[in-house]
Design a protein with these regions (language model features):
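Iron-sulfur-associated redox domains of electron-transfer enzymes in respiratory
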Residues: 8, 20-74, 80, 84, ...
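Residue-level recognition of alpha-helix initiation/capping sites
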Residues: 19, 141, 151, 194, ...
Length: 584
């Protein structure tokens, strides 16, 4: 409920009225008074650890942290007094004295919050000796932590605890030796980390980042430089909603087809749309759901989606008893890799071992998914050879000095380049469930369902990122749910275990808002880094769907050809071998 009670305050001698209970920081920013901060995340991390947000309050001797103190009637606040400016400078200088300031070679050089705050404070001289801890980490793990860049803001701790409920990070040491490390003194590879990457996208510096695989692709000895290799790039749906942000381009200009041109300029031989494999996933998953519904007593319910490796990892570590309820369908990434190393290789007369398949994803967990057992369909090595996040591919493009603004648009390659609107919405929370039910409805009734207000898929209620839905297919009502974030997943599972709710089909995405807010996406400023603030990415994908000539996976001609020429039918023996997992 919105608080309508107002209090009268002054900020920099200007009288204002703001809602009672408002934090000083929010009151200042809402009224145009800039207050810097480094640790604050609204409703998540409000601990005043960095002390960069301090302000002066009349009648209080000490400076006050504005992120965790509320306005009060008659309060007079100074945001930029000499005393405040000096305190902020000293606090940031002390942070820099323990920070590895290799800014020119840092992956966050262009969007480091610490660097920006230091610049805004006009810090031009290092007044304190620089000493930072040595980086001791497993360099092969997809998530890298550099202790020399950690400013102890505790954002990662709070995001993992409050949003993802995995508690991977914790505070260790005392006094000046206080730091953040993996909980229970574990190595990161021994922890239950799902590799969702939310700690990375909320870190103000490069203390947390993905393992960089750009050099393996674009280095002097990289895959693109090897004339004996056929290089294939496959692009996830959510990438098109965000890649332009790294170049300051609007979504209207930074289209999927312009991204194809960009990847061709980089040197990839083929560029395919993972939306194709999303359509393929829908064909398998929707038919699997219908097959289970025909023998309801044989299975435990609900059936969960399985395309998000962060969610699958979470289920493995937290609720292994639920694994039989996960769809056996591989993710679109792994389905595509299997098809490329078999069907595509045979069709083009290329030995599978001579194909390098690079998946471009909004996700860090995909870097681990590609090495899981059963992901070697041709018997010649991994189906997907490398995963680059959206951030990594953009760094690669910049390193090649490609002027994206001058490139024209280009279609995805055949024969695996056709996709539907149903495949595009995989990148948004609820999209997988909706796409699957569009095709399930057609399989049962022989007719396509309406899309939009007249759709048989009805939203019964929505709370935050949780949606409860229902669809009537020939008199059979399926009760469904779609949710994002692992904390939401835990709450739903616990509610089901208590008998408070029952569902037939549930979609889970590890990242809040879905893949559009994945751990590998471009990093936005912390005050624009909540799911509601990234609604434009969701709308971008929904727009692609609305404009698509074909909006049903079962109408994808390229998918139909794949079944006719190679897979035979959904859930066939060959389809099961290539497109499904035997066990989790």
């Amino acid at each position: 409920m919105v608080n309508t009670n107002l209090v009268s305050i002054k900020i920099n001698n200007i009288p204002l009225q703001v809602p009672e209970g408002t934090r000083i920081l929010d009151a200042c920013r809402a009224n145009g008074f800039h207050v810097p901060y480094l640790c604050y995340l609204k409703d998540i991390n409000e601990i005043g650890a960095c002390r960069v947000c301090v302000v002066e309050v009349k009648g209080i001797h000490h400076l006050v942290t504005s992120c965790n103190n509320q306005v009060q009637e008659g309060m007079e606040i100074l945001t930029n007094s000499p005393r405040v400016r000096e305190a902020r400078k000293i606090n940031v200088e002390l942070l820099l004295s323990q920070h590895h300031t290799n800014c020119p070679t840092c992956v966050r050089s262009s969007n480091c919050e610490l660097k920006q705050v230091a610049s805004d404070l006009n810090l031009t001289v290092d007044r304190y000796k620089n000493e930072y801890p040595e980086m001791i980490w497993t360099s092969t793990f997809p998530l890298i932590r550099d202790a020399g860049k950690c400013i102890k803001c505790m954002r990662c701790v709070q995001i993992c605890d409050k949003i993802q409920t995995l508690n991977i990070w914790d505070v260790s040491g005392t006094g000046s030796h206080t730091t953040v490390d993996v909980s229970h003194n574990l190595e990161i590879k021994e922890s239950d980390c799902s590799l969702c990457g939310q700690c990375v996208t909320h870190c103000p510096t490069a203390a947390l980042q993905e393992r960089d695989d750009v050099e393996a692709i674009n280095g002097i000895h990289g895959e693109l430089a090897n004339d004996d290799k056929v290089t294939v790039a496959v692009v996830a749906p959510a990438v098109r909603a965000a890649w332009g942000e790294e170049f300051g381009l609007s979504p209207e200009f930074a289209t999927d087809r312009r991204f194809v041109s960009t990847l061709k300029s980089v040197g990839f031989d083929y560029v395919f749309d993972v939306d194709f494999a999303a359509d393929l996933t829908i064909m398998e998953e929707s038919n699997e759901l219908l097959a289970r519904l025909q023998q309801p007593d044989k299975y435990s319910w609900p059936m969960f989606t399985s395309c998000c490796p962060g969610w699958v990892s979470f289920a493995k570590s937290q609720y292994p008893e639920l694994l039989p309820q996960l769809s056996t369908a591989k993710s679109p990434q792994q389905m595509f890799g299997a098809v490329i190393k078999t069907y595509f290789a045979q069709k083009k007369g290329i030995a599978p071992e001579n194909i390098t398949c690079v998946s471009i994803m909004p996700c860090m967990s995909k870097k681990r998914e590609l090495i899981l057992p059963g992901m070697d369909s041709a018997g010649t090595g991994q189906d997907i050879d490398y995963v680059l996040t959206t951030r990594e591919i953009c760094r690669l493009i910049k390193a090649d000095h490609i002027d994206v603004s001058r490139l024209s648009e280009c279609d995805f390659d055949d024969p695996l380049g056709e996709a539907t609107g149903a495949g595009v919405i995989f990148g948004a929370s609820g999209g997988v469930l909706e796409a699957a039910l569009r095709t399930a409805y057609h399989t049962v009734t022989g007719e396509n369902p309406e899309i939009g207000e007249q759709s048989p898929l009805k939203v019964l209620r929505q709370i935050g990122s949780f949606k409860e839905l229902e669809i009537d297919i020939k008199g059979v009502k399926l009760h469904c749910a779609a949710l994002s974030s692992l904390g939401e997943a835990r709450r739903l599972i616990q509610a089901m275990k208590r008998g408070e709710c029952r569902y037939d089909f549930v979609e889970v995405m590890a990242c809040p808002g879905g893949c559009i807010n994945g751990g590998g996406q471009p990093i936005r400023p912390s005050f624009q880094n909540k799911p509601k603030d990234c609604a434009d990415r969701d709308q971008c994908l929904r727009g692609y769907d609305a404009r698509s000539a074909i909006r049903f996976s079962h109408e994808n001609k390229a998918v139909q050809t794949l079944y006719d020429e190679y897979l035979e039918a959904p859930l066939s023996d060959r389809a099961h071998h290539l497109l499904h997992v035997e066990e989790y």
